[in-house]
């Protein structure tokens, strides 16, 4: 992708302090966007923001008022938000459901599902009023292909996948577009030891399908967010349901 593809665009990335979110932030900045990097850990977002000359915002995405303040701050400092990447998520709480801690289990839902809801809820009225905007939600292949242990993560991502798909459908007649990006196993800090099994494959092309990066690394996946910004890909996205290399390396991009 060439540089300066998104001059004048303002992007807000939640969960932007590390992993996929940090890679998205760097890619968007390289394309010329003004980027706000948001996460709970200030040190992490400040470091990423420093690297890309962006805006660092400390936020708890489960706190409605904090999310509203975040959006207000970003638009005050950078201008109207053109792209929201709702990427914040957690993946802890493993083991059997019957041995899990209910508070820890629910925390996964609060971050992964409520966080996406609150962020979308905060930016959508502004986007609709302006008549433009893109929202990209990070789901997970785990929401379609459940694992045997982490029920909280799989169940929460199933909810995120459907939340995004339903939101996209409800906004189909508006100028605002919503995309759900659901990778398979990804080599990030969140996946921990599982990263050893995360696939590393080249992009796969298929007739009438969006060609997406099927790699499992955060830096490779980041480009998909940029591609979703461009109108010339929308016809393909509308015809693309799924590109799947294997059960553990599936990427769904739904509009």
Per-region residue spans from a language model:
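The beta1-alpha1 cofactor-binding region of Rossmann-like NAD(H)/NADP(H)-dependent oxidoreductases
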Residues: 59-70, 102
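Conserved mid-core segment of classical short-chain dehydrogenase/reductases
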Residues: 68, 91-106, 149-152
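Active-site-adjacent segment of SDR/Rossmann-fold oxidoreductases
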Residues: 145, 154, 166-176, 217-219
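C-terminal helical subdomain
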Residues: 180-181, 196-255
């Amino acid at each position: 992708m060439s540089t300066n593809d998104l001059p004048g665009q303002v992007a807000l990335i939640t969960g932007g302090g590390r992993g996929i979110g940090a890679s998205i932030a760097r890619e968007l900045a390289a394309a010329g966007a003004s980027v706000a990097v948001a996460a709970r850990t200030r040190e992490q977002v400040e470091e990423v923001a420093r690297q890309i000359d962006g805006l660092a915002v400390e936020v708890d995405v489960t706190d409605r008022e904090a999310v509203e303040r975040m959006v207000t701050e970003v638009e005050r400092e950078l201008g109207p938000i053109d792209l929201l990447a709702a990427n914040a998520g957690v993946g802890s709480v493993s083991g059997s459901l019957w041995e899990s801690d209910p508070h820890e289990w629910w925390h996964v839902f609060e971050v992964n599902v409520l966080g996406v809801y609150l962020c979308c809820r905060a930016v959508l009225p502004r986007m609709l009023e302006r008549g433009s905007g893109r929202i990209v939600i990070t789901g997970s292949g785990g929401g379609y292909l459940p694992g045997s242990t982490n029920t909280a993560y799989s169940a929460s991502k199933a909810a995120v996948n459907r939340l995004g798909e339903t939101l996209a459908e409800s906004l189909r007649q508006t100028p605002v577009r919503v995309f759900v990006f659901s990778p398979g196993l990804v080599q990030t800090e969140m996946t921990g030891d599982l990263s050893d099994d995360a696939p590393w494959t080249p992009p796969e092309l298929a007739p009438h399908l969006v060609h997406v990066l099927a790699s499992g690394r955060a830096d490779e996946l980041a480009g998909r967010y940029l591609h979703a910004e461009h109108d010339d890909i929308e016809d393909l996205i509308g015809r693309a349901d799924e590109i799947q290399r294997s059960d553990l390396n599936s990427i769904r991009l739904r509009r």
